Structures are given as structure tokens and as C-alpha cells.
Swiss-Prot record:
Catalytic activity reported: alpha-D-glucose 6-phosphate = beta-D-fructose 6-phosphate
Pathway it works in: Carbohydrate biosynthesis; gluconeogenesis; Carbohydrate degradation; glycolysis; D-glyceraldehyde 3-phosphate and glycerone phosphate from D-glucose: step 2/4
Protein name as catalogued: Glucose-6-phosphate isomerase
Enzyme class: isomerase
Task of the protein: Catalyzes the reversible isomerization of glucose-6-phosphate to fructose-6-phosphate.
Top-rank lineage group of the source organism: Bacteria
GO molecular function: carbohydrate derivative binding; glucose-6-phosphate isomerase activity; monosaccharide binding
Amino acid sequence: MNGDLNSWDKFCNYLWFDKKLNIWLDISKINFTSKEINNLEDKFVDVFSSMKELENGAISNIDENRQVGHYWLRNPSISPSSKIAEEIRADINAISEFGKQILNGDIKNKNNKQYTDVLWIGIGGSGLGPLLITESLQKCSRGLNFSYIDNVDPFLISEKLEELSEKLSTTLFVVVSKSGGTPEPRIAMEIIKSHCEKNSLEWNSNAIAITMKDSKLFKKATSEYWLKIFNLQDWVGGRTSITSSVGLLPLALINENISEFIKGASLMDEATRISDFKNNPAALLSSAWYLTGDGTGKRDMVVLPYRDRLQVFSKYLQQLVMESLGKKFNRNGEVVNQGISVFGNKGSTDQHAYVQQLRDGIDNFFCIFIELLDTPSTNIFDDKENPKEYLSGFLQGTRSALSSENRQSITITLEKLNCFSLGALIALFERAVSFYAELVNINAYDQPGVEAGKKAAANIIEYQQKVSNLLDAGGEYSINDITSLFDNSVSESIFFILREMCFGNDNYLVKGDWSNPNSLVIQKLNS
């Protein structure tokens, strides 16, 4: 056995298939030898042991002193207490029942009209997970129509409100925030709530919260008598929340099968729990990442699903992989700067874009092809060229063209895309990320870089208020004048704040040239 990317023996030896899941995994086009992958088996003894401890309830998110329990969501019986198991089952039943009541009209708005739409407010995994669910699984004219606000872009918020203007009274407003303190969903929520109140539209009776018990959002939703509150456990992280209420509520509201989604994830969890290294798909997948990047993440992951419905999956993996694996320090406190960069879109579209560079340019990546074998049950393709055959041909052709230049790839094949297979696919990558983190000795479940960004943003927001108050009080100020009052190290930030606040705003008199920040003198005019 050698690293030959086109070896039939290697393909046969490392092809994984599970007949319960009907999923194939092929890592043969990763450049490794049998000796190299066999050397990882000893490492996986500790990897499997660590995963067992995590599932048994060990504190795995050290920074926040929290357990990591998304695996319990798919199989409550493995959770560390009967109380947790009962809560998980109760949450699933509550969401399933609520979805049925909304869709069949048992729950209507204050005007006795059936709900038609959902405006989903959440950021990170709280937005990407639901978006993946609806984009991948929602069928035409089935369930409620979904719109998303996953940012505080003022144009996004105004456009969504305009799009829904005639249907806001029959729109469910779902706000997702575990703590209730995340600025982006809080700000979007307040803007939309205010808009509804100004236009004599219902907010409270149309609003749903997904949050932790006793969080700021929980208390707000309770005191204002929102329509519903669903639980988001403190041991569920945003990037692994798709099998919690965050992912199950969208499934219920588009009339898809929650049980099948959970079953697919649970069966993949079983397949990735076994200690037989070469028959564990997540062990094979994470080993391929490790070997192709020399354990340092030196190759980017390019995700190419050959099905439009999975286009969001690339973005979903971008967060799951990069937020979990992008770490400065390992568990020993040593600087390692780990991580795998992820990008992608869909095939065959990308064959007419960056695949040119993948084949002929810098060799700093590996591809993950995702293939589906099913065809729509329709007669529109009778006696015509079958697009499925062309799509498959484009995938195989791209894979072959890359390997001919020794460019590496992994191929995952699903029989069909449905709730069951999507749940399984997500669970496969969740476990592979965990395994890879163990291989390189980092914590996959903290996010100090994200927290640092939040703190820095909070500082800027504080400076914005200080600058606004200063200008409101009257007088002319240069950037140097302002920084001398606050902090001489933030001149660049003050420039950005003034530009955002004053450029093109007739309420401010600006002297000087914006291309020369030191020349600027700014005064607020009397209104």
C-alpha cells in the first residue's frame, strides 16, 4: 500500500459503507500510506477514551465550566442523569406538538388567522443551523415560509420587514439566544418589536424564545407573555445546537420528520462510537484531515456538495470546523495556532470558478465532494438528457482531474437527501471535529477568540457613545483632541467611529479632508 491517489486496492481497503445509513466514505484520494494511517491507531485509543468521558458528562468546555451534551440530544438514555433525559424527551414532544398545532391551525394569531411565516432571529449556529434545515429539506408550499435575520445590517432588517409587511400579523418571530445577552439578536429583536408596536401589530403573542431557563431572554419572554418559550440547555453550544430546539423547531414548522432527523444523527453517533478505528467513519475522516495537513492544518478544506439543496452546508461546516479547531493554544498552554480553513459553494457551479486554481494553482487544500444518488420523482426528464447523470459525471470528472495532478480529495456519498441522512451527515462531521481536536490536543468546545472579539466590540460601542456625547455637548474636535480625552492608543478606532457617524450626515460640520485624518475637525450642528 502506498500514497497513490489512483490505487484501486487503496480505494477498496479504505472505502467505508453502512447499510443502515446508506452512506459511503472514501478517503483513498488523500495522500497517505498504510503505515502512516496505522500509526494513528495508538493515538485513537486516547481519542476514543476522551470522547467516552465527554459523553459521560465530563466538563469539556473548561472556560465556561460546562458539560458538552449535544450527543445526549439524539439519545437521551446516555445522558448522565434521568432528569436530563426526561427534559430532552419533553422538549422534543413539546416542539413536535407545537408544530402540529401551528400547521393545522389549532394555534392562531390574535385575529384568529393561521400563521403563514417565520422571521428567525439568531446569529452563528443559531442562524446557520435553521437555515441549513430549511434550505436542505423544505419542500415547495409545505409548512411556513422562513426568513432570517442573522446580522444587524440595517438594510437586511429593513428589507425583511418590507418583504413581510403584508404578512407581519401572521408571522412568528423566533428569537434565539442562549444567554439573552448576545447583542445582534437582541438589537434586531428590539427593532422589530418596536416596528410592530408602532404599526399596531402584535409582537408578544407572535413571539417565541429559544433560550436557557432564567436567562435575560427567558425573563423578558415570560414577563411579556410571549407565545412560547423553548429550552436551550447550557450544555449545548451554538455550533452543535442543530439537534436541539434550535434545529427541531424549524423541522416542525416546515412539516418535516423530527424523529427521522434525530434517528439519523443517533445512528451515525453509534457508528462513530465504535473503537474499531478502520470501521469508524469519523476516525477515518479526521485521520484524513490530520494526515493531509500534517497535523497542523496546513491545507484548506474545500467543500463541494453536488446538490443545490446542500449549498448552505459549506457555510455550516465553516463555523463548525473553524470555530472548533481554530485555537492559539493547546491544552498544555503551548502556542500551536491550530485550525483548518473551510470554504466552498456547490458543484458543478464551482467547476466554472475556483476549481481552475485547485487543479493548476497552489496545492494548499483538499476537497470534500458530497454526492447524492437519488433523482426527483417526476416525469419531466423522460426521454431527455438526465441532469443527474451529467451532475455525477461532472463530480467524477473533477475528482479525476484533481487526482491526476496529485490534488487530494475525500468523497461522501448519500443515497438521498432527507431528514435522516442530513442528521447523519451533520453527526459525522461533529464527531470528526471532536476527534481531530483530540489528535492535536486542543479544546474543540471553547471559543476564546470569539469572546475576545465580543469584548473588543463592546469597547468600541462604549467609545461610540462617548464620542456622540462629546459632540452633542458642543464644540469642535479633531481626532487628536478626542483621543487625548479618552485614550491615545485608539486614534484609528475614533476615525472609524467619526466616519460612520458623520460622513454624509448633515447634522455634522466636517472641516478638512477624509483622506487626511489629521486634518479633520468635526462639530455637531444645532438641530
